[in-house]
Amino acid sequence: YERTGKIAFEVGAFTNIGEDHISPIEHPTLEDYFASKLKIFSQRRFAVVNLDMDKVDRVLEAASRCERTVTFSLTDERADVLALAIRNGDCGVVATVRTPRFTRDIVIPTPVKFNVSNALAAIACAEALGISEEGIVHGFEGVFVPGRMELYPSVSGKILGIVDFAHN
């Protein structure tokens, strides 16, 4: 569990916790996995935390040793980075995002809500690092992750295939 033990990160982001890595070859229990994930905050300067996840109080406690914590959420008004509105657009999802420095629409070129949460995490990381508003917006232009919610409509448009295997 010390795969990144010698790396000093500027930002450590904790997006969620689930049972997807519980197995004989990874983590034997959810608690073991959770404790392992919390270690990221001992190797970082800034913490980014999703207020929408389970066990958020424990995550915030672990993040408190960081120089600064930036939070994000799809729904929690207390978040530093918040999606005020989410709607479908021509090129993906359009989220009206509020940060400590700006409020504006950002096009997220992936078609599902959980990717909005991932985008908010990226925006929170950029916020922690002081990246400009334009730099953040520009960073989403042309984003494409192979194998992550790739849509393949049939010629008729009546059938939609979805490829989504890029979990980790």
Residue ranges, per PLM feature:
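Short, glycine-rich nucleotide/cofactor-binding loops
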Residues: G161-N168
